[in-house]
Every structure is written in C-alpha cells, then in structure tokens.
C-alpha cells in the first residue's frame, strides 16, 4: 500500500516499442506501449498500434481487460472499434489481432503479473504470410522494473515478443 493514490498523465510515461513488423513493400508497423503502472500484482497500460500492426494469439498471466479508445482491431470477422471492451480471464487467449487502416489505441489492465503466453501460432503465421510481413527482433524495453528483469532473464523471446538484450 502506498498510502495515497498514484496519479500520472500519459504524456509523462515513456513509450516502449513492443513489436515491429517489416512488410514486403518496405514499410514497417509497430505496437507501442506505455506502462502506466507495473507491479507484480497488476499492469495498467496504454497501447498504440500503427495501421496494419498485428499481435499473435496469446494470453496473459492474470485476468485481462482492454478498452478500445480509438481506431479498431480486427480478428477474423470480429471488428473491435472504439468503445469496445474485451475481457479475458486468466488462461484465455485471443487473436491474432490486426490494427485497422487508422491504427488503434487502447487502455488495458491485467490483474496479475501480466507475463504473456503463446496461443496457437498457425493463424498468426498465416496472417503474416498473407500480408507479406515478418516480425523483427527488438531491444529489451528500457523501463522494465527489477522484479520483471529478474524473472525474464537476459532475453525474452517467444511467439508474443522478440526482445533481446543484444539487439
């Protein structure tokens, strides 16, 4: 317990590049994240998806809530536009998601440590192939707290992220 509220403005929170995709035509699309609050008990975050950015089928350790603030995300026939709420309980997976033509912004909250885990990768790989895209490795985010760095170790590469301390 802090004994008082934690109040932060989004402009005061640094953005981290979570995922980047390179497309056959040479353009890139990324997913950017701001960790508003990050603790072993919960994660509050904001995402900005560039148009066409994708996220693999995955879940997180903890119940997970997303609210689409602007733009849209698509998963097959599902279109989650601004105002859409997505709720996943611990163990649920979702995706692959693809940002719409204007990208997407969302607010998310995970009640738990938030570590991602992979779902079935076949649909994600098929989506990347159909878009002429590939995921590229990124440096480990700079603003991870010590408890998370200790848990992840030097590199954290999965079908969800490709972070490396040597990139």
Predicted regions and their residues:
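Conserved short histidine dyad/triad with adjacent acidic residue
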Residues: 26-32, 37-59, 89-93
């Amino acid at each position: 317990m802090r004994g008082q509220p934690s109040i932060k403005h989004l402009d005061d929170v640094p953005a981290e590049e979570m995922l980047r995709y390179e497309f056959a035509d040479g353009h890139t699309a990324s997913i950017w994240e701001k960790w508003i609050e990050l603790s072993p008990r919960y994660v509050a975050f904001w995402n900005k998806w560039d148009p066409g950015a994708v996220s693999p089928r995955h879940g997180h350790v903890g119940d997970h809530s997303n609210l689409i603030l602007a733009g849209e995300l698509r998963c097959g026939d599902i279109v989650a536009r601004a105002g859409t709420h997505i709720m996943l309980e611990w163990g649920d997976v979702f995706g692959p998601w693809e940002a719409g033509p204007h990208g997407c912004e969302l607010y998310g909250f995970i009640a738990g440590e938030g570590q991602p885990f992979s779902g079935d990768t076949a649909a994600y790989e098929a989506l990347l192939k159909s878009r002429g895209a590939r995921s590229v490795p990124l440096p480990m985010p700079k603003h991870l707290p010590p408890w998370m760095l200790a848990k992840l170790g030097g590199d954290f590469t999965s079908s969800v992220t490709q972070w490396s301390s040597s990139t």
